[in-house]
Amino acid sequence: MENEESGKSFVVQWNNSEGGLSEGPLSVLWSLIESYKVDIFDVSLSRITRDFLSFLRISETLSLELSAEYALMAANLIYLKSKALLPDPGFEEEDYEPPLPPELVEKLLEHKKFQLTAKKLSEMDQTQTGVFRRESNVTLDEEDNWLDVSLLDLISAFHEILESQSVEAEIPTLLTAPHRFTVEEKMEKILFTLREKKEISFPELFEREKPEKAEIVATFLALLELSKQRILRAKQHKLFGEIRLFLVEGHWNGTEQQSKD
């Protein structure tokens, strides 16, 4: 009974795209860890599994989709716990409490980092809520006369991509997905594409069937890094129109030589 009551304080909620409230299993796990007031590497796998299952028992408002996510996480925790508690002939300590496995710790730390990044982007976006934009009918006639794109425009376009229905749900691979996407690899891919096509639209960076959120974030960070290094420029031919990406003049030969080495 004590566990069920204490479990009510472990609910973590945020606004979803439909305006309602959502809860995620990784956020609940992180909230549990914070309530223990110990280092994440010292958290008992048995304890967090027990408390997570207790949380599920008292949760009555989960949607069908979220229930499936929680059920999968619960199954993963139970599997990891049973695996960790298998008898080890070389280890005889009776009170041994297995810690969280490295793969779960890694996912939790990634999740927290992503949450902090999303919060920062949201705060930056909210600073623009008092600014009313008018759709501009002014198109720049000269082909080479483009408007520079601001960071806030890029962030807005990034949010649209993240909220797209084509983004793949990552729940089935919460604990098993390896690091398949790095910023460095995405930088190379963007440069290769621009060398071939000369210019591309912002959405073209993410044109893969059901891209994962991790891939989208890595691609966006690669875009920002290339822009920071003045290798790439983001422009639009119409105020608040489609964002297009170009290589800065002077980097064509350098990038081509690097690709040949």
Curated annotation (Swiss-Prot):
Sorted UniProt keywords: Cell cycle, Cell division, Chromosome partition, Cytoplasm
Location, primary (coarse class): cytoplasm
Classification via InterPro entries: ScpA, ScpA-like_C
GO biological process, one term: cell division
Location in or out of the cell: Cytoplasm
Cellular component, GO annotation: cytoplasm
Task performed by this protein: Participates in chromosomal partition during cell division. May act via the formation of a condensin-like complex containing Smc and ScpB that pull DNA away from mid-cell into both cell halves.
Annotated family: Belongs to the ScpA family.
Assembly with partners or alone: Component of a cohesin-like complex composed of ScpA, ScpB and the Smc homodimer, in which ScpA and ScpB bind to the head domain of Smc. The presence of the three proteins is required for the association of the complex with DNA.
Protein name: Segregation and condensation protein A
Source organism of the structure: Leptospira interrogans serogroup Icterohaemorrhagiae serovar Lai (strain 56601)
Encoding gene, per UniProt annotation: scpA
